[in-house]
Amino acid sequence: YYHGESAESCLTQIEDLIDTLVPMDVREARDAVQTLLPPGAARNALDCALWDLEAKVVGKPLWQLAGLATAPKPLQTAFTISLGDPAAMENDAAKAAAQGFGLLKLKLTGEGDRERVDAVRKGAPDVRLIVDANESWAALDIEAEASALAALGVEMIEQPVPVGQDALLDGIKSPVPLLADESCQSSADLELCARYYDGINIKLDKAGGLTEALKMAREAEACGLKLMVGCMLSTSLGIAPAFLVAQAALWVDLDGPILLAEDREDGFRFEQGMIVAS
């Protein structure tokens, strides 16, 4: 969950709207939800459920309603290498590469990052690498750090500085794109992101659903921002709407169901590093 949400808090928010939404038609209800709930998991759940209901009512696949020109195709998804000592991360990277994952995402802390990336590169010399700096580079020479990681084959860096300190990136010349994650919650943040970042990471639990995520993707493209689509830990049901938005993304990080002990039946398949709709 995002920002301290829980299943119970989300359910309460949704139940409080039942009497308001029941008299509305599905499109009216979906429009109303955008203002009745703040961005977050509750609005995401309700918004996506209403998209699904509308698709059933009109008898069209959801991808058509969402404005896609063709049915969604399989996508290469990142597999996340959890933070650990370099030797453990090297071993995890080697295992992931052996399972067919060609894009790995590393969690970093601002301390020992180069050593960790170097170890992962040794464990998986042929994969693509992206990293999430987790707001940890405020005290570092950001240009030097980005250049060092680029030399190790890193092709993108997420959220190098803390939320609210985005101006630290003003004038920074990075050899690889810098993307906003925590600094980009919804479309209201795009103006700031266009000033300091090269792209954004859209997560439906941040944005508050498919409606806002599609809007963000359109407006990001208009601003010249590169697009990544990520996820919180969730089943294939939670990933499915993000999979539609991800069709237009340069980087896809939808490995949430893999990290669960058990996914729902008829969920996505993960084959050779690709996420494939059932």
Provide a role label for each language-model segment:
Residues 103-105, 158, 201-203, 228, ...:
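Conserved beta-strand positions in the central sheet of alpha/beta enzyme cores
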Residues 46, 59, 104, 132, ...:
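Conserved, mostly hydrophobic/aromatic
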Residues 56, 172, 221, 246:
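Anion (oxyanion) recognition and catalysis
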Residues 158-162, 178-188, 204-212, 260:
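A general structural motif
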Residues 139-149, 186-196, 208, 216-217, ...:
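Catalytic cores of alpha/beta
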Residues 63-176:
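Metal-dependent enolase-superfamily TIM-barrel catalytic cores that perform enediolate-based chemistry
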Residues 1-58:
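Metal- or metallocofactor-binding catalytic centers and their adjacent structured scaffolds
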Residues 230-278:
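Flexible C-terminal active-site loop/helix
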